[in-house]
Regions:
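N-terminal glycine-rich phosphate/adenylate-binding segment common to multiple enzyme folds
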Residues: 53-159
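N-terminal beta-loop-helix "entrance" segment that forms/cooperates
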Residues: 38-61, 231-233
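Glycine-rich phosphate/diphosphate-binding loop of Rossmann-like nucleotide-binding domains
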Residues: 4, 10-36, 151-228
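Glycine-rich phosphate-binding loop
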Residues: 65-83, 218-241
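Short coil/turn connectors at secondary-structure junctions
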Residues: 4-8, 39, 69-73, 104, ...
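Acidic, glycine-rich active-site loops and adjacent beta-strand->loop/helix elements
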Residues: 47-54, 80-82, 195-198, 227-229
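Short, well-ordered secondary-structure micro-motifs
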Residues: 144, 200-202, 233-235
C-alpha cells in the first residue's frame, strides 16, 4: 500500500453471528477513518463460510481467495454452522484454511477489562486486566487437519511442532512484548505448554528458552508453565502481564 492509497480490506462476514457483528465493526472503522487524517479504507465484501459451502460445495470461491491475496488485510466474521458439515463430519472453517494459505502462524488475542463490565476474575475491577495470548495457529493438531484416521474403534490425529514455525512464533512474541514495554505497558512473556507430560512440548519449551537467550537483557522477564497451572493462575489473579 502506497502512502496516499486507501487501505484495502477484504470483508468476509461469514455465517450467523459473523454477519450480525460485521455491520457494527465496519461502522467503527468508518468512524476511525472519519476522525483520522490521511487514513482511508476501501472495503470489498466476499463470500465464505458454511452457507456458501451448502450452496456451492466450496467453503469460499477462488475469487475470495484472490481478493484476500490482493488486500492489505482480511476482516473475517465467525464462520461455520453446526448443521452444515464436510463429509468427514468436521465443520466448515475457511478461517483455518486461510491460516494455511497465508501462513498466519501467530494468533494474537488481547484481553482487557471493559469499564463497567463484570468479571469472574478475583480483584479484576480494582487491578484491571491486560493480557495478550499469542497462539501458534498452523501447527500442533492443526497440522493434522483433514489427515486424521478414524476407524470404528478409534481415531488418531498427529500433533506437529517444528523448529522453523516455533522460532518465528517466539521471535514475533518477543518483539511484540518489547513494543508493549516501549509504550509503557507492563510485560512478561510466558510460554504455556504441556512440557510436563509430552516430549513435543518439552521440545517447544526448549526452543522458547533458546530464543529468550538471544534477546537483550532489556527484554521483559520470561517464564514457562504448564497449562493446568496456567488455568489456576489466571482464575486466581486480577491482572496479568
Amino acid at each position: 500500500m502506497k502512502a496516499n492509497d486507501s487501505f484495502h480490506i477484504a470483508v468476509l462476514p461469514g455465517d450467523g453471528i459473523g454477519i450480525e457483528v460485521m455491520a457494527p465493526a465496519l461502522e467503527v472503522l468508518k468512524k476511525i477513518e472519519a476522525t483520522t487524517p490521511n487514513l482511508r479504507f476501501r472495503f470489498t465484501e466476499a463470500a465464505a463460510g458454511a452457507i456458501h459451502y451448502k450452496e456451492t460445495g466450496k467453503s469460499m470461491p477462488d475469487s475470495t481467495i484472490k481478493l484476500c491475496e490482493e488486500a492489505d488485510a482480511i476482516l473475517l466474521g465467525a464462520c461455520g454452522m453446526p448443521s452444515i458439515r464436510y463429509p468427514d463430519n468436521s465443520e466448515i472453517m475457511p478461517q483455518v484454511e486461510l491460516r494455511f494459505m497465508f501462513a498466519l502462524y501467530a494468533g494474537v488475542r488481547p484481553c482487557r477489562l471493559v469499564p463497567g463490565a463484570p468479571s469472574p476474575i478475583v480483584g479484576a475491577a480494582e487491578r484491571g486486566i491486560d493480557l495478550v495470548v499469542i497462539r501458534e495457529s498452523t501447527e500442533g493438531l492443526f497440522a493434522s487437519m483433514g489427515k486424521g484416521v478414524v476407524t470404528h474403534d478409534d481415531a488418531r490425529e498427529t500433533l506437529v511442532i517444528t523448529r522453523k514455525t516455533s522460532e518465528r512464533l517466539f521471535d514475533f512474541s518477543f518483539r511484540y512484548t518489547q513494543r508493549r514495554k516501549a509504550r509503557g505497558l507492563p510485560g512478561q512473556l510466558v510460554c504455556v505448554d504441556k512440557a510436563n507430560v509430552f516430549k513435543a512440548f518439552a521440545f517447544f519449551r526448549e526452543m522458547f528458552d533458546e530464543c529468550a537467550a538471544r534477546y537483550p537483557p532489556a527484554c521483559p522477564p520470561t517464564g514457562s508453565m504448564s497449562m493446568p497451572v496456567r488455568r489456576c493462575w489466571c482464575a486466581g489473579r486480577g491482572t496479568s502481564t
